[in-house]
Amino acid sequence: MRRKLIIGLCILVVLLAGIGIYLRNGFYGNCVLERRSLYVRSGSEYRTLEDSLDAAIAHTAFFRFYACHIELDRSFKPGHYVLEPGMNVVQVARMLKLGLQTPVRVTINNVRTPAQLAGKLARQIEADSATIVGALTDPATARKAGFDSVTLFSMFIPDTYEFYWTVSPAQFIERMRREYDRFWTPQRDAKRQRSGLSRLEVMTLASIVYEETRQSDEMPRIAGVYINRLRKG
């Protein structure tokens, strides 16, 4: 009788250990096999998010269980998320719950009209081009930034920036105003004045140069060519 009890206890321990390992692997084992981006649009339904994750992660049953536990279906954040190999379902669910976005890189160069800039931005952030154009051409927005609708474009300094994918057009413009103020140091402004160019002309020239080359040692030569053309009319 005692022998049977011991055997039964051993079997129970093995079963419990097996269940524990199974659950641990399900919740904390690797559920992401390859790096990929996940875009969650504002106002998305939870079912849409689940469908996207079904194609991106393993252990989906465990994800659904944990997501239900933290009420992810009631509260998840839109944004751009990067699923990295080695992540588990707990990490993925918490990332979406807390809105731990990965910024996107936004390159501004060779744009001379609101429509061109809006088209470029709309491929890199959530807002559509029509909404972006509306903000870029809004006189009130330009005045708030300290410009008018004509000179607002001199604020956009050609470079590559990091934004959250969910950045609104208004937030984008505010950020670019800060970058503009940071760029125009007294030393740079004095150098610009000596060149005889306006800030708008400098920004236009910078956009052209940035489009032609990314090599910093070539930029002065190319800029000099265009400055000579401007002076010759």
Pin down the residues of each PLM region.
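Conserved catalytic or metal-liganding residues and their short signature motifs at active sites
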Residues: 1-233
